[in-house]
Amino acid sequence: MTNTRKNHPLLKIINNSLIDLPTPPNISSLWNFGSLLGACLTIQIITGLFLAMHYTADTMTAFSSVAHICRDVNYGWTIRYLHANGASMFFLCLFIHVGRGLYYGSFTLLETWNVGITLLFSVMATAFMGYVLPWGQMSFWGATVITNLLSAIPYVGTDLVEWIWGGFSVGKATLTRFFALHFILPFITSALVMIHLLFLHETGSNNPLGVPSNSDKIPFHPYYTTKDFLGLLLLILLLMTMALFYPDLLGDPDNYTPANPLNTPPHIKPEWYFLFAYAILRSIPNKLGGVMALILSILILVMFPFLQPNKQQTMMFRPLSQFLFWILVADLLTLTWIGGQPVEDPFINIGQMASMLYFSLMIFIMPTTCFIENKMLKW
């Protein structure tokens, strides 16, 4: 009698990925965030699909169509707020997932790590374009400011910006193409997730100790399916609490004002999950320098495996690196706070110092500490 689960061409793939997958027995709850990100992506695609059924990507009616969804569509307000706060949950899980990768040295799995960074860029692009769609004041001016940064690229910058806008300013053409791209990108992200998992299952998961666990592995089901399900319940609880009780907590009040090209809001700022990068962008007085720092703030993760010559994979037994890691976390929280503040003293100076500390930690201080810890191992 053949086991269908193990022999059927399609079920075999699911079985080897989710049921009989050999998993280290000691991975902590921080390893839950991969599955939570999958859940977030699913929630976003489903809620987004229902929103797209009622949304119109036209400058004259976009704002009204969102109001119509909230007022006239059955449970439209729920779907809209689940989608908006689902993005915040998505990024919260993403940042913890990346942080866990840095702390426990998962960046040594190079292919998985690099596909993960591509995924991060993909999700950030999707979120940015989604923020433009309600066509409120912050949507319009956010789109204008961020796309205009590309004009800093020498020689082709201005042409590139006008090509993206589809005209000489952000308008109907921009909104239409942003909607099209916002719709297609999550499916591209889903394909990248498959590649991410494919590479991960080639090497197997890392674990908190950073030691090979080939001699002692357990099946993914029922142990980690149960554990992941608990994480999923907590995620849904948090998302529902946000969407039903505090739906506008993380939003901007300016986005409840229809887009007006003649009236600039006093403080243009993106959603909270982009504030750290926005603070880095603003901390450099030069436009091109700011754009380069903005891109490098994420792209530096690609260099991380080569900047960390550590002999112990995880930071679990490296107190100096642990200390610096938590300084990095505190620095990112500071940058997030600064990104939401107006451009005036003392925020300018704090932002510049925090940006300098961010790049110093990543490029110089953490690698040097790794080198010192390697030397200390020999004593």
From Swiss-Prot:
* InterPro entries for this protein: Cyt_b/b6_C, Cyt_b/b6_C_sf, Cyt_b/b6_N, Cytb/b6-like_sf, Cytochrome_b, Cytochrome_b_C_euk/bac, Cytochrome_b_N_euk/bac, Di-haem_cyt_TM
On assembly, the entry states: The cytochrome bc1 complex contains 11 subunits: 3 respiratory subunits (MT-CYB, CYC1 and UQCRFS1), 2 core proteins (UQCRC1 and UQCRC2) and 6 low-molecular weight proteins (UQCRH/QCR6, UQCRB/QCR7, UQCRQ/QCR8, UQCR10/QCR9, UQCR11/QCR10 and a cleavage product of UQCRFS1). This cytochrome bc1 complex then forms a dimer.
Q: Which UniProt keywords apply?
A: Electron transport, Heme, Iron, Membrane, Metal-binding, Mitochondrion, Mitochondrion inner membrane, Respiratory chain, Transmembrane, Transmembrane helix, Transport, Ubiquinone
Q: Which cofactor does it need?
A: heme b
Q: How does it sit in the membrane?
A: Multi-pass membrane protein
Q: What name has this protein been given in UniProt?
A: Cytochrome b
Q: Which GO terms describe its biological process?
A: mitochondrial electron transport, ubiquinol to cytochrome c
Task: Give the binding site residues for heme b b562.
Answer: 83, 182
The subcellular localization recorded is: Mitochondrion inner membrane
Chain positions recorded as heme b b566 binding sites:
97, 196
Do you know which SUPFAM superfamilies this protein is assigned to?
Answer: a domain/subunit of cytochrome bc1 complex (Ubiquinol-cytochrome c reductase), Transmembrane di-heme cytochromes
One Gene Ontology cellular component: respiratory chain complex III
Function text = Component of the ubiquinol-cytochrome c reductase complex (complex III or cytochrome b-c1 complex) that is part of the mitochondrial respiratory chain. The b-c1 complex mediates electron transfer from ubiquinol to cytochrome c. Contributes to the generation of a proton gradient across the mitochondrial membrane that is then used for ATP synthesis.
Source organism per UniProt: Lepilemur sahamalazensis (Sahamalaza sportive lemur)
Superkingdom classification of source:
Eukaryota
